[in-house]
Amino acid sequence: LQKVDMIEKMGYDNLVISIKSSDVLMCVKAHQLIAERTNYPLHVGITEAGTVFSGNIKSAVGLGIILSQGIGDTIRVSLTGDPVEEIKSAKVILRTLGLRKGGIEVVSCPTCGRTRIDLIRLADQVETMAAEFDDLDGVKVAVMGCVVNGPGEAREADVGIAGGIGEGLLIRKGQVVRKVPEEELLTVLRRELEEMRSERRN
């Protein structure tokens, strides 16, 4: 805050303060301390967080703690990678904390012995597709690996798909709608989302 005082004495008071560290716990503590001592807006982030994998984890933990305490006005997810990934990660962090509306939440189960479909690839495809429907605020999509537990686990989702052997299920609000050939699961899910979008616009 000494530098803030120095800048204020020069006649400037339209400021945003940024305090960053690659140490998550240090960064959290620093933001807690500065938030107690100033009303200036704070730009928060875990700097030099690392690669997409480790950087996302550090950023989610650090920013999650800071933002959940009502601290922070703007954020930056700092990754060694494609800047587009930084934006995507920031949106998910904000949405998870209830600080941002818009976009679809995709939930998917971990793979297990009952999985009879390439769930990892399918979940990635659904997440990529979901980004095209950023206007569907509050919609939850489930991607499940089997038809045994899939419908039950997807009951809180607006729409979901569950994989089987050569075919899967289309699920709405936990209820099985119909069987779908495996190669058509993504297409059928897209159609469901397009119908939701059309209904909301009308």
Locate the predicted segments by residue.
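Catalytic alpha/beta core domains of metabolic enzymes, predominantly
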Residues: 1-131
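Hydrophobic alpha-helical bundle architecture
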Residues: 125-155
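Fold-independent oxyanion-binding glycine-rich loops
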Residues: 20-21, 46-47, 69, 112, ...
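Conserved structured catalytic cores and adjacent interaction surfaces
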Residues: 83, 112-116, 147-153, 176
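Beta-strand/loop-dominated core regions that host nucleotide or nucleotide-derived cofactor-binding catalytic loops
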Residues: 165-171, 175-198
